[in-house]
Each structure stands twice: as structure tokens, then as C-alpha cells.
Amino acid sequence: MKHARDALFVYGSLLEEATRERIVGHRVAVIEARLIGFERRRARYHYIARADGAETVGMVILGLTSEDWRRLDAYEEVPRLYTRAEVEVVTSGGPLRCWVYLPTPNWT
């Protein structure tokens, strides 16, 4: 299995190309992906939660730099609203370990 420390699975507003470009300041490479065992929910913002038999369809942003991460963390309000966690997603090229933003326990 591949492990991409410079990759982020997205499932909400960051699915939109214009939003991604506005946040990181440049175009980024993406691939389609699925996260098994989580479902997408919405309160004030989109978030995902563990759920048996669920699947979240999204994308993986590839090749993120430390500056990209700084901007993304600020956008996602880490650590107040979200925290980064490692997950395994399914892509057309097989499984991939990457990061995802999960809600903090007291946010939802």
C-alpha cells in the first residue's frame, strides 16, 4: 500500500476546484477516492463520522507542501474545529494512506 504524507482526502467544500485554489493559492493535482467506514454529515460544516457499511466519496489532493498544509489547517480551523488523522482510502490505483480532517469531539 502506498503512503502519501503530502496527500489529503477531501469530502466537503474542498471538492470544489475554485475553493481549493483560493485556499492553497495554486492548482493542485487530485484523484478520485473513497473512504470506507465513514459517512458524510452536515451541521454548520461538512464532516465525516465512523459508520459501519458507509462510504464517503471524495478526492485526494496530492503533492501538498508545508505552506499548503499551513493554509489548509487555517481554513479548517485546526485544532478548534478539526484535527488531522491518517486514513486509508481506495483509489483507482489501489489503497492509499493519506490525511483527512476529522471534527474535534466537542465540535459535533
Please place each PLM-identified region on the residue numbering.
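Glycine-aromatic micro-motifs
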Residues: M1-T108
